[in-house]
């Protein structure tokens, strides 16, 4: 059933170049929406939309299932701060989870947190998701997403 899956990821901050962010979402019908806003050197916002095949959606679900992110809780994760924020929302089957934390610079930040095991799951899942999305956008539109 296609209506049992949704994913949205956001990472951003407000700084001297304004509101800079990366956001993408996969909708139940297979629509991938992507936005990348950087005002550095007067860059313009990149917005792209495309539909992905059912097999891509199935692979996305597999990546999420394998990560076991649905077993995690962000209560002990660093809260968003002046450096930035990350948000991950997933609906998969009858589960609806939402995480909010600060930007993570490296595994050092993960290891120094109050919940390194849980934050590590989040960190690696986000890396996998970004890699997949950048590949899909790059292949579909022949652009460099970052």
From Swiss-Prot:
List the subcellular locations.
Nucleus; Nucleus speckle; Cytoplasm
Q: Tell me the outcome of changing residue 72 to R.
A: Abolishes interaction with PYM1 leading to increase EJC association with spliced mRNAs
Looking at the UniProt entry, the stretches that span the membrane are: none
Q: Which PANTHER family match?
A: PROTEIN MAGO NASHI HOMOLOG
Family note: Belongs to the mago nashi family.
What job does the chain carry out?
Answer: Required for pre-mRNA splicing as component of the spliceosome. Plays a redundant role with MAGOHB as core component of the exon junction complex (EJC) and in the nonsense-mediated decay (NMD) pathway. The EJC is a dynamic structure consisting of core proteins and several peripheral nuclear and cytoplasmic associated factors that join the complex only transiently either during EJC assembly or during subsequent mRNA metabolism.
> What protein is this chain from?
Protein mago nashi homolog
């Amino acid at each position: 059933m296609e209506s049992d899956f949704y994913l949205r990821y956001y990472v951003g901050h407000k700084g001297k170049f304004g509101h800079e962010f990366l956001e993408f979402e996969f909708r139940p019908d297979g629509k991938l929406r992507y936005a990348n806003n950087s005002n550095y050197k007067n860059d313009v916002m990149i917005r792209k939309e495309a539909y992905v095949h059912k097999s891509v959606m199935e692979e996305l679900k597999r990546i999420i299932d394998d990560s076991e992110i649905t077993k995690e809780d962000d209560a002990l994760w660093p809260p968003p701060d002046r450096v930035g924020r990350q948000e991950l929302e997933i609906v998969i089957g009858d589960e609806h989870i939402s995480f909010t934390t600060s930007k993570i610079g490296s595994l050092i930040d993960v290891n120094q947190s109050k919940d390194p095991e849980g934050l590590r799951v989040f960190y690696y899942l986000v890396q996998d998701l970004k890699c997949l999305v950048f590949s899909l956008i790059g292949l579909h539109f022949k652009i460099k997403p970052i």
